[in-house]
UniProtKB/Swiss-Prot annotation:
Gene3D superfamilies: Ribosomal protein L14. It comes from the Bacteria. GO terms for biological process: translation. GO terms for molecular function: large ribosomal subunit rRNA binding; structural constituent of ribosome. Binds to 23S rRNA. Forms part of two intersubunit bridges in the 70S ribosome. Transmembrane segments: none annotated. This is Large ribosomal subunit protein uL14. InterPro entries: Ribosomal_uL14, Ribosomal_uL14_bac-type, Ribosomal_uL14_sf. Keywords: Ribonucleoprotein, Ribosomal protein, RNA-binding, rRNA-binding. GO terms for cellular component: cytosolic large ribosomal subunit. HAMAP family: Ribosomal_uL14. NCBIfam families: rplN_bact. The lineage of its organism: Bacteria, Bacillati, Cyanobacteriota, Cyanophyceae, Synechococcales. Belongs to the universal ribosomal protein uL14 family.
Length: 121
């Protein structure tokens, strides 16, 4: 579960390395899960890239350390909390996605992120 002040790693090549969640988008929501959109601040970034430190960006959560129950009864959990930066059209800002992503992203219509990911779990 991602909430305000949570730090996340960035799973794409947009230039940001670490994010801090500012707000979970939705109607008065406290926690974000895989597939939810958050507003975050860039805390660490690579120089001469598209984003820089202290930029406020939108991102979609692709991995969480919290255990997730699926409708089939399986549970899944990842080693880190990670997000992919998106623009206002819900498309990723980077051209590559690193690490596995959850299958729930396809159900939330983030098919571009799923197609860029090396592994879908």
């Amino acid at each position: 579960m991602i909430q305000q002040e949570t730090f996340l790693t960035v799973a794409d090549n947009s230039g940001a390395k670490r994010l801090q969640c500012i707000r979970v988008l939705g109607s008065n929501r406290r926690y974000a899960h895989v597939g939810d959109v958050i507003v975050a601040s860039v805390k660490d970034a690579m120089p001469n890239m598209g984003v820089k430190k202290s930029d406020v960006v939108k991102a979609v959560v692709v991995r969480t350390r919290a255990t997730m129950r699926r409708e089939t009864g399986n549970s899944i959990r990842f080693d880190d909390n990670a997000a992919v930066l998106i623009n206002d059209d819900q498309n990723p800002r980077g051209t590559r996605v690193f690490g596995p992503v959850a299958r729930e992203l396809r159900e939330r219509n983030f098919t571009k992120i799923v197609s860029l990911a090396p592994e879908v779990i």
